[in-house]
Amino acid sequence: MNSLLIMGYTSFDLGIFNEKDIKVSIIKKTIRRKLINFLEEGLRWVIFTGNLGFEYWALEVAKELQTDYEFQIGTIFPFETHGQNWNENNQIKLASFKQVDFVKYAFEAYENPGQFRQYNEFLLENTEGSFVFYDEENETKLKNMVEKMKQSSNYEVYLLNFEDLQEIFEEMND
């Protein structure tokens, strides 16, 4: 696989409001393992959409892994205005999404809901697979995108769920 889209729950979805929360370290450990597997299989591009939570933690891990693996990181934001109303702490995280190898904006500004459909289609057409933190028992707005991913032919979907995280947590405590 050449390019991998990373998406998942936001920190708000997960009820995580402190970066020092133990859940963050469990999630990051899981991300690290999975990304290393992808990279050792020849992954060349990791693509983000600029969301807080899972994506941001994956971005941090990916940036750390760039010291040992040769791959590119890209962020394709839906709009140039993405994150403009975020607080100061989150603005720092937004800046981190912009300090990667490739940054593009699908649209200048929001005009209509159809832009999200076009944006999602673009992401699916320009990546070969996805690594998504999503559990079908805990639905969010990611549901439609995950369904589109699964329906796309020749598109690999790797889902991370809460059960996977529980296994990592138990491993850490052994």
Curated annotation (Swiss-Prot):
InterPro entries according to UniProt: YspA (IPR010697)
Domain of life per record: Bacteria
Coiled coil: none
PANTHER family: UPF0398 PROTEIN SPR0331 (PTHR38440:SF1), UPF0398 PROTEIN YPSA (PTHR38440)
HAMAP family in UniProt: UPF0398
Sequence similarity: Belongs to the UPF0398 family.
Stated name of the protein: UPF0398 protein LACR_0544
Organism: Lactococcus lactis subsp. cremoris (strain SK11)
